[in-house]
Structure formats: C-alpha cells, structure tokens
From Swiss-Prot:
Pathway: Pyrimidine metabolism; CTP biosynthesis via de novo pathway; CTP from UDP: step 2/2. This is CTP synthase. The active site is at residues 378, 514, 516. Residues 1-265 are annotated as: Amidoligase domain. GO terms for cellular component: cytosol. Mg(2+) binds at residues 71, 139. Keywords: ATP-binding, Glutamine amidotransferase, Ligase, Magnesium, Metal-binding, Nucleotide-binding, Pyrimidine biosynthesis. The gene is pyrG.
Length: 555
C-alpha cells in the first residue's frame, strides 16, 4: 500500500518545495522505505521542453527521455530512485489527455468538466507515478491561491477523502518573514496561507516554515495555535549555506518520525552518515579552483542548475571549493578573451540558437591554444568541433547547419537517424515539431581504448542522457582526425560521435550528452571530477611558472 505525502506552498513562490520534498525523501529512504517523488506543474505547456530557460530555468531530462521540471533533478540528487516521465506532468498534459479521450469517445458523449474529469485524470496520473513505492511525495507546483493550481488541490483533497488520513498526509511550506524595520518575525502571512488552504478543504498536517533564522519556540507555538497544527508538527527551516544540510536539519527536528507516526509506518532510525560526509567535505575544502561557465543564459543561474550542482559535487569529491564564474558569451564577442585570463578551467554548456555562438568559439580556441582544461557539453562539444575545424583543419567558415545552413564545411548537422538503447531506429527531419522531437534520454556510448574518456569512466561502455537535434557530421570527421582530433566515444551502432578529446592537450574533452543529469552529491560524476582535478593541476602549473623567475634570482 502506497502512502501519499502532498507538499504545497504558500505566501510566495520559490520557497524550496522541491528541495524540501527531496530532503524528506532522503530521510524516509534512510529509514528503509522505497520512495518516489512527483511534481505537478500548473502551467498549460505540455512539458517545459520548448520553454525559454529565462522563463522556466533548466529542463531536466529523465532516463526514459522526458523533458521535465528542474525539481526532478533535485529528486534524483537526493534519493536513489530514477525519475521517469510519470514523475512529472502539467495542466497541459492533463487537458491534452482528457481531450484525446473525449475525441475517442471514452466519455460516452458526456459533458467534460473540471470536476470530475480533469480531477480524475490528475488522480489517475498520481497513482500511476506512485505505483510500487512505499511512499510517494507529491509536490504541487505554484502557490496556494493561484487559479492555475486549483484543479490539483481539488484532486488531492479528494484523495484524502478516498484514502483516509492513514494513507495521505498534507505538508504546507510557508514563509515566515523577518521585518527589519519593526525588528519582528511576522507569522500573519503563514496564518493567511493556511486559511486559504483550509478554504479549499485541506487542513495541513505539518507546516514547514521558511525563515532567515531558526524560529523561536514562542513563534512556533503561535503558528500552531492559529493554524490548528500541533506544535511538534511546526517545523523550522531557516536559510543554510548548503542545500545538502537540509536532510540533517529536518531529521534532527523529527520530521521523518513525525511523518511515519501519522501514516502508521514502522520504520528504522534514519542513517544519514552519507549526508554528514557530504556536508563536512563541502564545508572543509583544501583547495580552490575557478571555473568559467561560458553561456547565453547566465542571467538566470537556474538555467544551469544541474551543471552548477555537478561542479559542486566534483568539488566535494576532490576537497575543492569550486568558484563558478558565469560569463555571457556575447561579452566575449565584445571584449575578447580577457575575461577568461583569471580562470583555471573553461566549461561551455548546452544551448540552442545562434546568439553568442562566436563568443563560445573564442572561449574554446583560447582553452585549446593556452592549454587550459576545457569541458564542452552538448553544444559545447559542437563548438569545440567548429573551432578545431576552422583553426586546425583549415576549414574556413566551418559551422553547424543550425547556425549557417549554407556553410561550406557543415561539421555539425541535423541528426536524422539514430539507434535508441532499445535497438529501435528513430528518425527526424526538417520541419518536425520542436516539442519532443530531439534525441532524448539515456543512450549507450562505447568508449575508445586508451582514451582519456575511458580512463575517467573506468569502463568501456556507459549510458548517458541526451537532449539535442544536431550531431557531428561523419563525412568530415576523417579530416579532423588527421589534424589530431580524437573520437573517444561513439554510439553503440558506431554512427554518431558522442565524445571527443585532443591528444596534445592536458585536458580537452567534449561530450554530446549531458553528464550533469546523473551527477549526485554522494557519488559525483567521473567527467566532472576529472575536470576539477585538471583545473587544480592547471592552477598549480600556472603558479609554478609565475614563481620561476623569482626562483632564478634566488639561485
């Protein structure tokens, strides 16, 4: 029997429902329970795949190829479960499926309404996503009071009636602000948020109160009194330097035990030693390295959420504080590579569109010519290919057909056919819809013997997640190999280039996939760990060069 924990948010958005849900999931998992997490998004897009990163932040890709909310990345980083397309759905997906059923005649000519048809579809999708888990944590996107969230809230209200309070539990996340002018903590926004939730028919069982500082006992008692929530169930969650402390903080306040008690679950004590080690390593670095992330969405760091977390994970596993310098590639186009001179390593992440492309190419050229560690991910690998073709293989004006359809040297072109990991041949062509038409999800990659990639991974075959439409053009790859480009990874059918490196460079790696999606704080990822180690080595080498003249004088 699956128990359901519904997490809602009030007062303001961006309080951290996803992190809180994932942290509670980590606690329950450490108590011996199998856990899954679902995210219900109230927007009408079918999925976030075609949304601007400035609007939505990162699109997280699941193993089975779904383009989902970035919160699923948090879920996978905190718990051991692998998310699928069933773990995230939107209002748009729900309505599309209901309308499809209506067109098919499934409702026998009935009038289709929000209640019961939309709410029934939501409940069915929740049950489907939760199937097989001891506990399903269901995060409802948006803020209580928003019109968009009402069908989801109505659906979970109905599930409480249908399943009872031994199988369902409501957690409400609210803001308890500190008003500096008055010098007071204000509980009124939380009171009104719970009042709004109760007007919908939902009484929260547990409150998680977000604040700048830990809540005093008097304020917790006041919140309990006015919200009809027992005082032990009013949890204080103040700001922390590392999100990986949160499972420990919530465990220490008894949240996991409180949940198990309310849901009548017999569970063991939570063993969070792994999380203690992660936090200790993050708080006590022995080294510092500066990494430039050269992209076009740098004004919103959530656009590269999994990437920044993967760099932090690599720092945890190398005892290094990773300082991330986000550099707009258009700024490099305007001001040149001067912006890169103080960094120890350069990373060019994925992206779409032609804006800022030449700045990324300059960054790749600067890294190649100056022996600076370079990590190109997805578009970042394609950028490295274009730069190498132009400046090492004498392919003047080489480009991707995404940016210049008439380029004389299309070293990167639309991928029209590939073999999925199930052995099925998938095809795409010009003019296909943008949504859901990319090469998506986990795909196997065969690594070249004696390559840097093979040494980093420690195995011959890996599976990594993809999200792209363009690939390296096999017709021109031979000329690039003659000039020193190494193809260190290929698709399992040998048709597609998955990884590249340079033999005459200290650390220059490109991959067509997104390794950041599978990095976790407890394990890290071999490519990111290798990249940070290379950055440290480059930093030490630079120090040695700078120290050399003074050493000569001493001699």
């Amino acid at each position: 029997m699956t128990r359901y924990i519904f997490i809602t948010g009030g007062v303001v958005s961006s309080l951290g429902k996803g992190i809180t849900s994932a942290s509670l999931g980590a606690i329950l998992e450490a108590q011996g329970l199998t856990v899954t997490l679902l995210k219900l998004d109230p927007y009408i897009n079918v999925d976030p795949g075609t949304m601007s990163p400035f609007q939505h932040g990162e699109v997280f890709v699941t193993e089975d190829g779904a383009e989902t909310d970035l919160d699923l990345g948090h879920y996978e980083r905190f718990v051991n479960a692998t998310m699928t397309r069933k773990n995230n759905f939107t209002t748009g997906r729900v309505y599309a499926d209901v309308i499809r059923k209506e067109r098919r005649g499934d409702y026998l000519g009935g009038t289709i309404q929000v209640i019961p048809h939309i709410t029934d579809e939501i409940k069915a999708k929740i049950r489907e996503g939760a199937d097989g888990a001891d506990v399903a944590l269901v995060e409802v996107g948006g803020t209580v009071g928003d019109i968009e969230s009402l069908p989801f809230l109505e659906a979970i209200r109905q599930m409480r009636i249908e399943l009872g309070d031994q199988q369902t539990l409501f957690i409400h996340l609210t803001l308890v602000p500190y008003v500096a002018v008055a010098g007071e903590i204000k509980t009124k926004p939380t009171q009104h948020s719970v009042k709004e939730l109760r007007s919908i028919g939902i009484q929260p069982d547990i409150l998680v109160c977000r604040s700048e500082q830990p809540l005093p006992d008097a304020e917790r008692a006041k919140i309990a009194l006015f919200t009809n929530v027992p005082e032990p169930s009013v949890i204080s969650l103040s700001d922390v330097k590392s999100i990986y402390e949160i499972p420990l903080i919530l465990r220490d306040q008894g949240l996991g035990n409180r949940v198990c008690e309310k849901l009548n679950i017999k569970a063991t004590a939570a063993d969070l030693d792994d999380w203690k080690k992660v936090v200790q390593a993050q708080k006590n670095p022995r080294h510092t390295v500066t990494v430039a992330v050269v992209g076009k969405y740098v004004d919103l760091e959530d656009s590269y959420k999994s990437l920044s977390e993967a760099l932090i994970h690599a720092g945890i596993h190398t005892q290094t504080r990773v300082v991330i310098e986000y550099i707009d590639s258009e700024a490099i186009e305007l001001h040149g590579t001067e912006l890169l001179k103080k960094v120890d390593a350069i990373l060019v992440p994925g992206g779409f569109g032609s804006r800022g492309i030449e700045g990324k190419i300059l960054a790749a050229q600067y890294a190649r010519e100056n022996g600076i560690p370079y990590f190109g991910i997805c578009l970042g690998m394609q950028i490295a290919i274009i730069e190498f073709a132009r400046h090492k293989a004498q392919m003047e004006n080489a480009n991707s057909t995404e940016f210049d359809p008439k380029t004389p040297f299309p070293v990167v072109a639309l991928v029209s056919e590939w073999m999925a990991k199930e052995g099925i041949i998938e095809k795409r062509k010009w003019g296909d819809d943008l949504g859901g038409t990319m090469r998506l999800g986990g795909q196997p990659c065969r690594l070249k013997i004696d390559s840097l990639a093979r040494r980093l991974y420690g195995e011959d075959r890996v599976i990594e997640r993809h999200r792209h439409r363009y690939e390296v053009n096999n017709d021109l790859i031979g000329e690039l190999e003659k000039k020193g480009l190494v193809i260190s990874g290929r698709s399992i059918d040998d048709r597609l280039v998955e990884m590249i490196e340079l033999a005459d460079h200290p650390w220059f790696v490109g991959c067509q996939f997104h390794p950041e999606f599978t990095s976790t704080p407890r394990k890290g990822h071999p490519l990111f760990i290798g990249f940070i180690k290379a950055g440290l080595a480059a930093k030490e080498a630079k120090k040695a060069v700078l120290a050399a003249p003074s050493q000569e004088k001493t001699d």
